[in-house]
UniProtKB/Swiss-Prot annotation:
Gene Ontology CC annotations of this record: mitochondrion
Cited Pfam families: UPF0240
GO biological process: mitochondrial respiratory chain complex I assembly
Name the UniProt record assigns to this protein: Uncharacterized protein B0035.15
Source organism, top-level taxon: Eukaryota
Length: 283
């Protein structure tokens, strides 16, 4: 029973608190109640002092006179300087496409107007290209000669400091490939393709030898040939045997010659491989 009364009593209390809070919020919205923010401890101590309240309530004539002496003069904001040059557009680039001073899409002044230790974008690219041709190992003697003449006679070398040019080339030089392209003979490439596909010379030799053996066995096992051979006279039989022996001898010589050629090819390939390995070690 006691719990029941507590439950009912707490519900009534909550309803009263809720009603009071709603009424208070309504008064705040109407402006009838002023909400004051919390005070700091120092402000609370100053509120107790009556001297501070008197100073705040007193009118200071000197401050009023000083305020009246102040004069503020306002003017319109100063107009900012705007350039009269047109910004680069597709139409302007198309109009100046054949103009040397607009080669890179923007105006480049004459050489006489460029100050010392300054260079144009076009001059920087030309200098980097010719200096790379001068120092590159892959350049031909004619290219190196032309590059040396350009670097010696160009106006950039006299206008810009040599140390600055060295720094520009060190940090902005173009990339260069150091590897060399290997040229392969088309016959060697065809032989490699045949070897990959199983059509190498060794395979051909074995296939040809098998074909010759099949032919010889076919002749030996052919009853018709044996019958004809038996009907021949002794002199004709000797000629047939000599022809077969000669055929075998020619085939044997051909195979030996081909094996010798393959041995030379293999030896050359091994020497080339050894030379390539030595060059790689030297690098």
């Amino acid at each position: 029973m006691k719990r029941l009364w507590k439950k009912v009593g707490s519900g009534v209390k909550n309803a009263n608190y809720l009603k009071k809070s709603v009424e208070e919020v309504a008064k705040i919205e109407k402006g009838e109640t002023k909400v004051v923010p919390p005070k700091y401890p120092t402000e609370k101590s100053r509120e107790v002092s009556e001297e501070i309240k008197k100073e705040l309530a007193m009118k200071n004539e000197s401050l009023v006179e000083n305020m009246n002496k102040m004069y503020i003069k306002s003017t319109d904001p100063v107009e900012r300087w705007t350039s009269t040059k047109d910004l680069p557009t597709r139409e302007s680039e198309f109009l100046h496409r054949n103009d040397p001073i607009w080669e890179y899409g923007f105006y480049e002044p004459p050489v006489e107007r460029i100050p010392k230790d300054k260079l144009m974008f076009k001059e920087a690219l030309e200098y980097l290209r010719f200096r790379q041709e001068l120092l590159s190992d892959s350049s031909s003697p004619a290219q190196k000669k032309q590059a040396a003449e350009f670097v010696a006679d160009h106006v950039v070398t006299s206008r810009v400091n040599a140390e600055t040019l060295d720094d520009i080339y060190e940090y902005f030089r173009p990339f260069e490939r150091k590897d060399k392209q290997k040229v392969v003979n088309r016959h060697a490439l065809a032989a490699l393709q045949d070897h990959v596909q199983g059509n190498s010379d060794e395979r051909r030799i074995l296939d040809e030898a098998k074909d010759v053996g099949k032919k010889i066995r076919h002749i030996s096992n052919n009853t018709k040939f044996l019958d004809e051979y038996q009907r021949l006279e002794d002199e004709e039989k000797d000629k047939v045997r000599e022809a077969i022996a000669q055929l075998r001898q020619e085939e044997h010589e051909r195979l030996n010659k081909r094996l010798g050629q393959l041995g030379e090819i293999e030896k050359t390939a091994q020497e080339a491989m050894k030379k390539a390995v030595e060059e790689k070690k030297e690098k």
